[in-house]
Amino acid sequence: MSFTKIDHYEKEYADTHHDTALNVTQGVEEQPIVSPYFKRRKKRALSTGEYVEGILAGNITILSQAITLVESANPDHYAQAQEIIEACLPHAGKSVRIGITGVPGAGKSTFIEAIGNMVAGLRHKLAVLAIDPSSERSGGSILGDKTRMESICNNPSVFVRPSPSAGSLGGVARKTRETIVLCEAAGFDVIFIETVGVGQSETAVHSMVDLFMLLQISGAGDELQGIKRGIMEMADLMVITEADGENIHKAELAQTQFQGALRLFPVPESGWRPKVYTSSAVTRTGLEEVWKGVEEYLDHIQKNGYFQHNRNRQNKYWMYESINEALRGSFYRDPAVEARIGEYEKRVLEDKISSFIAAKELLEIYFKDTRTLE
């Protein structure tokens, strides 16, 4: 019998036996994952008053929701976010703001977890704003600090909030300044701001904190190489981390080297000579000394008036930054600019027009359009 005849008989058999298990191809009817009787209830949006009331009461869930609203890029959220910030402002400003940065591998998260638990044990309420790097290629963010700081996240006196940097210079989240206000209004009296690493970016963090702490690891070759002078000049306090085991001697040597280097810098405007400490998050040694150094610095600048002077200067700086950000956003959202900017970009890439002339003409388009809208 030929294969053709076999195929014919198999087809004929299949056509006349529809109920055989071998011929069932679709299986039983798939049941819905969610019951058809279940009605998804839409979450009711909180009013500005409810947000503010919850924040002032120290409600962490509402605080987190408010921060998400402030960080949102949705224009519809902007007005309410600003109302919340404005209502919280009279209750803010009473915390100590500490910026913490360091070279890659300096163990910032480990150090923050160790000293953070210690600070919380001193009856402080601590907020940790861990600013994660956003990828320049994909715009994604690691947001991994909560996994690296497991024990501190379970401390009832500590609030950890990782925020994407949104590609901004230095890894500072676009709305970190407003987040600080909300955390202070919620009753947190110590705020740590962890940055992504050493670079130009740290200038932004320095402009929103009372104390700038620089972490450095020892035993990485020439201790003074790989760290920019500008970052060292901004530091009010330096910590050599991982000073334990066989690394203790290297840490002490690094401490001496950095202390000597810092003496060569001019005395800062605060009148404070930065100090260098060693610590170990593993053995918990040196943490109390570091915190004592923080308290000494804060006492010094409060007595000589630099504390308030610095905050006033920071407020002025952020006023201008807010203006710049608002103008930049208005420019790129303008319909006339959106319609022409691609054309100008192409002409610049083809060397048909200089970048300066392109910018000038795009600004003229923007101003003409805004005047027309008026």
Task: Tell what function each PLM region has.
Residues 1-90, 338, 342, 359, ...:
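Non-catalytic terminal/linker segments enriched in charged/polar, low-complexity residues
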Residues 63-65, 278, 289-367:
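Long, well-ordered amphipathic alpha-helical subdomains in the mid-to-C-terminal portions
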Residues 220-249:
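Flexible active-site lid/hinge loop adjacent to a nucleotide/diphosphate
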Residues 237, 243-303:
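Canonical P-loop GTPase G-domain recognition
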